Amino acid sequence: MSPATVLDSILEGVRADVAAREALISLSEIKAAAAAAPPPLDVMAALREPGIGVIAEVKRASPSAGSLATIADPAKLARAYEDGGARIISVLTEERRFHGSLDDLDAVRAAVSIPVLRKDFVVQPYQIHEARAHGADMLLLIVAALEQSALVSMLDRTESLGMTALVEVHTEEEADRALRAGAKVIGVNARDLATLEVDRDCFARIAPGLPSNVIRIAESGVRGTGDLLAYAGAGADAVLVGEGLVKSGDPRAAVADLVTAGTHPSCPKPAR
């Protein structure tokens, strides 16, 4: 039996936490709450705006870096991101390793008028309805965390609720699985969730193999405008940035710098 990876350990905790939440609020109750929520915003329209989009993340901690920032007011941070020009706000809701919560998602959804992404490790259909009930417009699905049949059903369920799935991959094989499942938005994570090692060339290897009608998002490794431009040159439509923003002294200005670079006439445009 192979030793457990970092991802395996995270998923074990997530399953336990989902079971605990479902014991308090049943699947039928969370489905009803999702159905009663305001309709989701148009994520695809936001991602297709001109230039390289910035998805700015509310992120307190990570397994690789530990504690990143004390975020006493996630709503205030999200508003700063929106004021800086972010197209989408990503909210970590995993509790054990990332110190996030559904309360953070609620606070951010109430604070901004742009789409919100729930970033978590989705392993149960319950979490999809939960995301919608708490106002998410977009939901992360990690290929490495799901068998193919589960990936297909999770993607279908996400879209059936009107949300957009961000399907995350780290290898060419995972990208192929994402495409076979019907992914319309694929995020290439430079970080291997099994080992936490970062491969900054990962996006440049995988993106050329993706069809032109698929939205391509570069995740991890964006430390500034130089990284954004490099990802743009490799075909990115958007970048997802967390650590670099929460550790900056001025998150609004940090987002604005990235947005300016991503919309500058000299910024490479994705081939379409």
Swiss-Prot record:
GO terms, biological process: L-tryptophan biosynthetic process
CDD domains, sorted: IGPS
Reaction(s) catalysed by this chain's protein: 1-(2-carboxyphenylamino)-1-deoxy-D-ribulose 5-phosphate + H(+) = (1S,2R)-1-C-(indol-3-yl)glycerol 3-phosphate + CO2 + H2O
Domain of life, per lineage: Bacteria
Alphabetical UniProt keywords: Amino-acid biosynthesis, Aromatic amino acid biosynthesis, Decarboxylase, Lyase, Tryptophan biosynthesis
GO MF term set: indole-3-glycerol-phosphate synthase activity; phosphoribosylanthranilate isomerase activity
InterPro entries: Aldolase_TIM (IPR013785), Indole-3-glycerol_P_synth (IPR045186), Indole-3-glycerol_P_synth_dom (IPR013798), Indole-3-GlycerolPSynthase_CS (IPR001468), RibuloseP-bd_barrel (IPR011060)
Gene3D superfamilies xref list: Aldolase class I (3.20.20.70)
HAMAP family on file: IGPS_A, IGPS_B
Name under which the protein is recorded: Indole-3-glycerol phosphate synthase
Lineage: Bacteria, Bacillati, Actinomycetota, Actinomycetes, Mycobacteriales
